[in-house]
């Protein structure tokens, strides 16, 4: 324990102001402190002052000289007791109990005869406060009556100096002035006697006295002594020899009682109890200088704080803890003692004290779901809920492997060692225990329901004993009695009790939802498919989802009344808030909610609380629906059960049960009258009880109540009113009523009037009037009763006519047995025999026959057996057949009822030919029972040796199977047998046996043995078999093995196999990849020679690098070659490394090549360094010059190669010339000493003035030449050089003014777009030049206008150019200008009707449209333009427009573009789209495209299952239909017969697939299966065989024809197995089942499987299932040929006997019989079909299956 100073909450005064008392409120919310100033200060839990109030004297007139001796808070923290020295104890109320507001008022006061010296308020005693007096008495103040009583008095009236209460509040000790410590015990039970006794006499006055886990006392002798509860001293600490310790003044235990603080002068000592040593220890002391004596001390009830007060009024607060611990950053654990921890939620600041009630040390704490506490001590387990602040502690001993479950907020579930423990939060015991291994939270439901209203407390648990048994346990029973056990036939996967524990909901693995009522012990199935279910929180309403329906049960007592809503998504939750209940449904994109009827939900809550008025108010506003009707009924029944008659009357009135409502109204009136007479509610009155018994149909109860009151007539009337005449007559007879006889006659009359002749006849029979009784029986249609009367009454001569009438009635009623008895009674044996046999009363018939007709006994025995067989009583029929000698019938009956022992015994006497059909079934029986030898014998006798072999194989008796096979099977059967056994042995990993079986089978099965050893990595065995049987594949086998061993890391073995395969290079590569160069070099040297070893050595050197690699290469003479190779491959680091290590003479060359590489990479700075290192500065300069980095180039030239300076300057100047930067270029040329280049630059640019200037300055010899060029006119207008445009214009205007128009024109024209960006200015100048030419220079007018026009068009002024041409009547030039500027309307207007101009304009316009890809405009122009538009659309991939335009151009164009479109889609792999294009837009029959068509067909039909597209198959069908028609109509069918037949096959295969898909969608399963069977004719190149047989087999299985499904799925499995083997073909597959069919036999095995492996396994299981079905013959269906009458495969288009050919049905593909043919033709091809199939198709679709045209049934 550590005490750390926290804060001072009251500062010290400058004078004496003793803190006389400190006390904490038990709820930790307040601290009260008082000093000698008589003011009580109130602080919050953190020590902040919140309030204060001044105390009062005992009497208002008394002087204010009292002091406060002690204070204590009440256990509920709302009151404060103050003991005062002026002979009184005041109780202050601090909190208003009604409003919770803070309010200080005196609620109790206890005046005494002398001064009050001390006070305590024991725990859990809110109305009892204990205080001590100066006269030695300890008194008890009772708050309820405001009186005080003496608990005990000191014999010598010794002053009470201290009081202390035990931790549990059941005891109080007091310390007295004479050193005695007394103990007072409160009575253990109410009314008991309290006791008191002297505990011990302390060594001094025990001013400091406390009681924790033991009693501690100290005083002025400086000793601290600890006593046990009997007063024996257990430990003491003596400080009498310590001068720094003075007398002890106060004592305070922490809430756990294991730590205590004693105050003394300027310090306080702390002591703790060591559990391990079972002793008290000093834990240290706190020195507080200038604090003076500690006058008061108090611990906070949670143990986290300790406060002390001083003589000067100071109050200090200390933080007390053993340790602190942060948990997951969300919680803080403060260990205030070893057995108490404060758990604080950091987010909310909420605190809870986790404390062991047994005082054990808390070792570990965990918090689950941020809410639930789990703590451990050595012997207990602590649990708590942070939200409700409820804690529990239970004894616990485990190894820590228990699992906790917190799904239920009321209880904690602990699963350990197969047992489930239920602990309710807030209780320190285990609520219940059960054994279960199924600890899924969805498989356990616990209900803890507190008492509400009249409803009692309920605690129940539902759990699984096993996965099919639910047990419901009552947790309130002493040992947990079982309320119900629910046995179910399917595994349960969810269960939950409702909140009251009256009903259990559970769901099984089949998604069936069940409701179990605990009261009625009844189970009801609510749903046959349920994917979500939940009780609505806080109610008995059930919400469930069944597929797309939301189901709600508002009343669990009426499970048939369900409310359903259609929904689209999945129910995810149920939310209740703001008086609204909503079901949340996730629809994928969004979430929606469905509101439930809140009124009906509230009704359930009201009924649960038995608040019937509220229940009625809830139901009254609602309409009467099935839900509300059920709830009215539920309320009525519950109201009747609790005698709420008015409520029940209202309920039945609401239900429309007027009779019950009126009856209850009478009962209510009776009860009201009884209440007035006798008091109470009147329901106990005998008349009310009798009526209620009558209502509940408790007739004996009602009768006894009426007879007890002497109400005989009322009792008789009661029975008469309810038509219980016999009870009425019984009452009348028993009471000797005067009207008893009349009552009987009245009863008989009533029976006759109501048609109850049977009852009337029974009355007459009892009276002895037999004739009347017989007449009544016959009248009532009861001839059997009449015959019974005749046979039971003897010595009566009955009228023969009467007897004949009875016999006729018996025959008419079918009572032949009774008629036979009557005939026998009348000694008419023949008629009796006939009646017995007609009524199947064979026992009586045989008895009669043995007496009268012995010869007929055998006949009747067989007849009896036949009849028993018809009644499915085969077991009983066996003996009758044996008795009659019908042996075959006896055997059949014995087998049918599985009496095989009897059948075997009977069959031995039969002829073998007769017994043959039964041998197989008997053999199968013996096989199932394990009698294999007997089974073998019967299989052999049944000529089914193959089945005997398979039986022994299944049983694992291989030798016996071989014995039977060798003795009875054919060669082919033996081979099939060996294959099957080999596969079985391989699966069992019996590889030697499997090898023998494969080799015994021979042929391709040898490859299976080889593959088996390969799969099992037994490579030696594999090579042995390959060498022995497949010598040509030995190298390939070695290579495969080597590759596998390489992957596995077995390199030595892999090398061996590579070498054996003559592939040593792969071995070398293998070793290189794993850096085993020695081995690689060894293999290369041994098998590849010197050159190979050199290559490996070079590669090795590269990996070694540095000197090692170079030395290796040098040693082998490959160093130079390696360097060159490294440079060429860009491995410069290796190249440098090798060069420096062994070939330094090549270093400059490597630097140069590396520099060139860096230059190409754009890394110029690095390249520069490498060029310099290579001694090539010129190349570095060239690099920078190339990149125009002149400064860098100049820097290198000046430093390394000055001869390059001039060249760099010239290059830079030329770049400036290209950029027209004349002056910089001139300066660079001059600097490079190349003035002639500067002169040439200006002359080329016609800048004559600058050229003349340069010549005069630098080249005087060139001055004359330049002047001559200028004077010759080449420089006209150009003398301005770089002058501005304004200068040129001014110069031209000057020429105009001087009438020098020629030079003016040249000057205007000298102005170009390079001189100015002002296009308006340019247009004006050029226009002025043209105008001058027009006006004054007519001879050059046209040239000038053309020049101006060209320039205007260059700057985009086409309209101005055209108008210029028009001004000189140059229409052609104007039109050209307008067309160039796209001014088509102006051009057309100018052209008028001139055809030449118009044609030119349209050509230009078309060229413009083409150049700008304006396809729509081109298309609208038609003709060849449309063709051009189509090509544009093709380029843009706008195929819809392509086909639309192409269709307008004719079918040939349409088919050509369809071909282009399809080709493009085919190349993109979109076979479906390609087929659709041809189907929709036409197809050409040119032979060069036939391969394309076939490839598209194969792409569609050979698609994998995931890529398969029924729409694509339909498009392919339409495409091939078009193609075949085009070929036939164009005469190509004969010319290209093979191709046409192939296309026809593709068409038919696609047609049947399309029809099958459509039929399947409409539920026409037989048509779908027939179509898919017809597809089988085209397996191989047309459609993959595995897909065809797979789909056909599944279709027949869905259609219910298992024999067809078995054969086809079995073929599919054979194909799948063949596909797993390399180089397999269909020829190796057994074809017996398809030998006489038109299904191809020899075809290519597909390379890619159509189905997944899981689907193949499903098919295997399905085939196995069908094979086990003995009712299936497991062969293809046959039919009789119409021509020859022989049986042939039902889908054959050609009879395999007579070769008769049949037309295929367009609906199914099946052959059409002549008598069943219908022909349909409607402006299309003639369609032949089977009548029934056609009608089924047309009724489903309304169209024919080929063209899709409207069609009608044909009968």
UniProtKB/Swiss-Prot annotation:
WD repeats lie at residues 14-53, 63-102, 111-153, 155-194, 198-238, 289-328, 487-525, 526-563. InterPro entries: Quino_amine_DH_bsu, TPR_IF140/IFT172/WDR19, TPR_IFT80_172_dom, WD40/YVTN_repeat-like_dom_sf, WD40_repeat_dom_sf, WD40_rpt. Component of the IFT complex B, the core composed of IFT25, IFT27, IFT46, IFT52, IFT74, IFT81 and IFT88 as well as associated subunits IFT20, IFT57, IFT80 and IFT172. Interacts with microtubule end-binding protein 1 (MAPRE1/EB1). Its main location: cytoplasm. Keywords: Cell projection, Cilium, Cytoplasm, Cytoskeleton, Developmental protein, Repeat, TPR repeat, WD repeat. Belongs to the IFT172 family. This is Intraflagellar transport protein 172. TPR repeats lie at residues 597-628, 696-729, 754-788, 813-846, 858-892, 916-949, 988-1023, 1048-1081, 1219-1252, 1285-1318, 1355-1388, 1455-1489, 1586-1619. It comes from Chlamydomonas reinhardtii (Chlamydomonas smithii). Required for the maintenance and formation of cilia and participates in the control of flagellar assembly/disassembly at the tip. Involved in regulating the transition between anterograde and retrograde intraflagellar transport at the tip. It is found in: Cytoplasm, Cytoskeleton, Cilium basal body. The gene is IFT172. One of its GO terms (cellular component) is motile cilium. Gene3D superfamilies: 1.25.40.470, YVTN repeat-like/Quinoprotein amine dehydrogenase. PROSITE patterns: WD_REPEATS_REGION (PS50294).
């Amino acid at each position: 324990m550590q005490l750390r100073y926290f804060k001072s909450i009251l500062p010290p005064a400058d004078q004496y102001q003793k803190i006389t008392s400190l006390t904490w409120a038990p709820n930790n919310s307040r601290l009260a402190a008082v000093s000698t100033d008589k003011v009580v200060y109130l602080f919050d839990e953190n020590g902040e002052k919140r309030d204060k109030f001044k105390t009062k004297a005992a009497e208002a007139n008394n002087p204010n000289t009292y002091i406060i001796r002690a204070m204590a808070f009440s256990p509920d923290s709302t009151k404060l007791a103050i003991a005062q020295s002026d002979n009184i104890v005041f109780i202050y109320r601090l909190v208003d109990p009604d409003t919770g507001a803070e309010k200080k008022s005196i609620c109790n006061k206890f005046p005494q005869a002398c001064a009050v010296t001390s006070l305590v308020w024991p725990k859990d005693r809110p109305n009892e406060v204990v205080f001590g007096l100066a006269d030695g008495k300890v008194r008890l103040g009772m708050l309820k009556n405001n009186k005080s009583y003496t608990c005990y008095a000191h014999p010598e009236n010794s002053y009470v100096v201290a009081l202390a209460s035990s931790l549990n509040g059941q005891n109080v000790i007091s310390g007295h002035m004479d050193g005695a410590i007394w103990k007072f015990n409160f009575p253990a039970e109410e009314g008991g006697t309290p006791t008191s006794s002297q505990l011990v006499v302390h060594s001094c006055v025990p001013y400091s006295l406390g009681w924790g886990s033991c009693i501690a006392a100290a005083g002025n002798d400086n000793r601290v002594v600890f006593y046990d509860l009997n007063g024996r001293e257990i430990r003491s600490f003596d400080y009498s020899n310590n001068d720094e310790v003075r007398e002890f003044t106060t004592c305070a235990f922490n809430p756990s009682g294991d730590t205590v603080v004693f105050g003394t002068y300027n310090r306080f000592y702390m002591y703790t109890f060591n559990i391990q040593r079972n002793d008290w220890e000093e834990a240290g002391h706190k020195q507080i200088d200038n604090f003076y004596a500690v006058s008061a001390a108090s611990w906070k009830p949670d143990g986290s704080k300790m406060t002390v007060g001083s003589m000067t009024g100071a109050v200090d607060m200390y933080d007390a803890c053993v340790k602190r611990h942060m948990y997951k950053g969300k919680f803080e654990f403060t260990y205030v003692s070893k057995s108490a921890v404060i758990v604080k939620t950091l987010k909310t600041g909420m605190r809870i004290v986790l404390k062991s009630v047994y005082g054990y040390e808390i070792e570990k704490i965990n918090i689950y779901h941020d809410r639930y506490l789990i703590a451990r001590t050595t012997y207990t387990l602590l649990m708590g809920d942070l939200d409700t602040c409820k804690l529990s502690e239970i004894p616990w001993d485990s190894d820590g492997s228990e699992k906790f479950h917190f799904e239920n907020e009321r209880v904690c579930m602990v699963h350990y060692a197969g047992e489930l423990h239920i602990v309710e939060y807030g209780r320190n015991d285990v609520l219940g225990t059960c054994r279960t291994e199924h600890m899924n939270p969805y498989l356990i439901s616990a209900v803890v329901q507190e008492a509400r209203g009249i409803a009692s407390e309920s605690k129940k648990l539902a759990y699984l004993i096993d996965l099919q048994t639910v047990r419901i346990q009552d947790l309130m029973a002493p040992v947990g009695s079982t309320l119900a056990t629910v046995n179910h036939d399917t595994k349960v996967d969810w269960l939950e009790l409702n909140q009251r524990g009256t009903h259990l909901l559970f769901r099984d693995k089949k998604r069936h939802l069940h409701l179990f009522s605990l009261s009625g012990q009844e189970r009801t199935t609510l749903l046959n498919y349920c994917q979500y279910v939940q009780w609505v929180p806080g109610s008995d309403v059930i919400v469930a989802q069944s597929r797309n329906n939301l189901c709600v049960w508002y009343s669990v007592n009426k499970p048939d009344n369900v409310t359903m809503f259609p929904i689209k998504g999945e129910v995810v939750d149920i939310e209740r808030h703001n008086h609204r209940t909503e079901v949340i449904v996730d629809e994928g994109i969004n979430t929606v909610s469905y509101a439930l009827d809140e009124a009906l939900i509230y009704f359930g809550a009201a009924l649960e609380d038995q608040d019937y008025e509220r229940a009625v108010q809830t139901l009254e506003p609602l309409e009467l629906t099935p839900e509300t009707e059920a709830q009215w009924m539920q309320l009525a029944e519950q109201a009747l059960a609790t005698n709420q008659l008015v409520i029940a009357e209202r309920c039945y009135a609401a239900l429309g049960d007027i009779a019950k409502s009126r009856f209850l109204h009478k009962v209510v009136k009776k009860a009201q009258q009884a209440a007035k007479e006798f008091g109470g509610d009147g329901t106990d009155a005998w008349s009310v009880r009798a009526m209620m018994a009558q209502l509940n149909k408790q007739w004996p109860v009602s009768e006894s109540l009426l007879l007890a009151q002497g109400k005989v007539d009322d009792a008789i009337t009661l029975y008469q009113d309810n038509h219980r005449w016999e009870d009425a007559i019984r009452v009348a007879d028993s009471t000797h009523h005067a009207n008893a006889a009349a009552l009987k006659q009245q009863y008989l009359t009533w029976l006759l009037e109501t048609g109850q002749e049977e009852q009337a006849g029974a009355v007459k029979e009892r009276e002895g009037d037999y004739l009347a009784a017989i007449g009544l029986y016959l009248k009532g249609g009861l001839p059997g009763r009449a015959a019974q009367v005749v046979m039971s009454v003897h010595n009566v001569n009955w009228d023969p006519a009467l007897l004949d009438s009875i016999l006729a009635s018996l025959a008419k009623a079918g009572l032949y047995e009774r008629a036979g008895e009557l005939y026998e009674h009348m000694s008419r044996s023949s008629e009796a025999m006939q009646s017995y046999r007609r009524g199947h009363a064979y026992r009586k018939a045989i008895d009669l026959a043995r007496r009268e007709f012995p010869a007929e006994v055998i006949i009747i025995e067989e007849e009896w057996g036949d009849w028993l067989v018809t009644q499915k009583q085969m077991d009983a029929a066996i003996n009758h057949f044996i008795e009659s000698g019908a042996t075959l019938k006896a055997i059949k009956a014995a087998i049918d009822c599985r009496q095989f022992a009897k059948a075997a015994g009977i069959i031995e006497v039969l002829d073998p030919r007769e017994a043959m059909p039964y041998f197989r079934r008997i053999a199968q029986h013996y096989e199932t029972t394990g009698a294999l030898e007997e089974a073998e014998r019967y299989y052999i006798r049944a000529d089914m040796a193959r089945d005997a072999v398979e039986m022994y194989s299944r049983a694992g008796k291989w030798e016996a199977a071989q014995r039977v096979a060798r003795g009875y099977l054919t060669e082919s059967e033996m081979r099939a047998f060996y294959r099957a056994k080999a596969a079985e042995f391989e699966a069992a990993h019996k590889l030697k046996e499997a090898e023998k079986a494969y080799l015994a089978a021979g042929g391709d099965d040898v490859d299976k043995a080889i593959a088996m050893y390969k799969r099992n990595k037994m490579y030696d065995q594999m090579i042995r078999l390959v060498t022995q049987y497949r010598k040509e594949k030995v190298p390939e086998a070695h290579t495969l093995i080597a590759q596998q061993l390489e992957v596995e890391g077995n390199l030595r073995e892999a090398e061996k196999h590579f070498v054996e395969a003559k592939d040593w290079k792969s071995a070398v590569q293998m070793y290189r990849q794993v850096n085993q160069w020695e081995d690689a070099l060894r293999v290369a040297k041994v098998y590849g020679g010197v050159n190979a070893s050199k290559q490996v050595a070079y590669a090795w050197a590269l990996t070694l690098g540095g000197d090692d690699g170079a030395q290796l290469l040098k040693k082998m003479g490959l160093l130079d070659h390696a360097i060159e190779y490294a440079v060429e491959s860009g491995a410069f680091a290796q190249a440098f490394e090798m060069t420096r290590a062994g070939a330094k003479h090549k270093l400059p060359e490597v630097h140069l090549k590396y520099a060139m590489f860096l230059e190409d990479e754009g890394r110029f700075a690095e390249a520069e360094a490498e060029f310099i290192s290579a001694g090539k500065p010129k190349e570095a300069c060239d690099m920078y010059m190339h990149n125009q980095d002149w400064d860098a180039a100049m820097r290198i030239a000046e430093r390394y190669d000055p001869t390059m300076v001039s060249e760099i300057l010239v290059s830079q100047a030329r770049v400036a010339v290209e950029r027209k930067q004349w002056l910089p270029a001139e300066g660079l040329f001059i600097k490079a000493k190349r003035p002639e280049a500067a002169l040439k630059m200006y002359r080329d640019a016609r800048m004559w003035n600058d050229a003349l200037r340069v010549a005069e300055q630098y080249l005087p010899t060139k001055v004359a030449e330049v002047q001559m060029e200028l004077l010759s006119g080449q420089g006209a207008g150009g003398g301005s050089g770089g002058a501005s445009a304004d200068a040129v214009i001014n110069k031209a205007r000057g020429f105009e003014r001087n009438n020098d128009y020629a030079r003016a024109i040249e000057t205007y024209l000298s102005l170009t777009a390079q001189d100015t960006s002002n296009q308006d200015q340019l247009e004006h100048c050029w226009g002025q030049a043209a105008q001058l030419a027009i006006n004054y220079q007519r001879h050059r007018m046209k040239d000038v206008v053309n020049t101006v026009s060209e320039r205007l068009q260059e700057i985009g002024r086409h309209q101005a150019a055209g108008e210029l041409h028009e001004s000189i009547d140059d229409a052609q030039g104007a039109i050209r200008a307008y067309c160039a500027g796209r001014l088509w309307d102006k051009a057309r207007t100018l052209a008028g009707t001139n055809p030449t101009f118009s044609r030119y304009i349209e050509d230009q316009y078309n060229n413009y449209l083409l150049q700008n890809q304006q396809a729509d405009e081109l298309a609208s122009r038609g003709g060849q333009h449309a063709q051009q538009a189509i090509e544009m659309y093709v380029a843009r991939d706008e195929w819809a427009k392509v086909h639309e335009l192409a269709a307008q151009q004719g079918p040939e164009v349409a088919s050509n573009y369809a071909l282009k479109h399809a080709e493009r889609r085919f190349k993109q792999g979109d076979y479906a789209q390609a087929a659709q294009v041809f189907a929709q837009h036409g197809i050409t029959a040119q032979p060069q495209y036939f391969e394309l068509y076939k490839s598209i067909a194969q792409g569609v039909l050979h698609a994998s299952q995931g890529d398969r597209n029924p729409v694509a198959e339909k498009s392919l069908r339409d495409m091939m239909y078009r193609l075949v028609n085009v070929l036939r109509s164009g005469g190509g069918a004969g010319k290209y017969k093979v191709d046409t037949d192939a296309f026809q096959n593709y068409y038919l295969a696609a047609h049947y697939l399309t029809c099958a898909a459509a039929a399947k969608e409409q539920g026409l399963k037989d048509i779908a299966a027939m179509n898919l069977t017809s597809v089988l004719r085209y397996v191989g190149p047309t459609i993959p065989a595995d897909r065809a047989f797979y789909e056909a087999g599944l279709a027949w299985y869905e259609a219910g024809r298992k024999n067809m499904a078995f054969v086809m799925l079995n073929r599919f499995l054979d194909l799948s197995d063949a596909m797993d083997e390399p180089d397999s073909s269909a020829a190796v597959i057994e074809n017996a089942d398809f030998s006489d069919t038109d299904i191809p036999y020899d075809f290519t095995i597909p390379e890619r499987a159509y189905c997944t492996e899981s689907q193949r396994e499903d098919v295997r299981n399905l085939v196995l299932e069908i094979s086990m079905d003995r009712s299936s013959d497991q062969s293809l269906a046959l039919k009789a040929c119409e021509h020859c009458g022989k049986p042939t495969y039902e889908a054959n288009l050609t009879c395999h006997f007579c070769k008769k050919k049949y037309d295929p049905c367009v609906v199914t593909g099946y052959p059409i019989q002549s008598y069943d043919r219908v022909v349909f033709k409607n402006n299309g091809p003639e369609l032949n079909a089977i009548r029934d199939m056609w009608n089924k198709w047309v009724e489903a679709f309304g169209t024919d299956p080929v063209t899709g045209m409207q069609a009608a049934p044909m009968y």
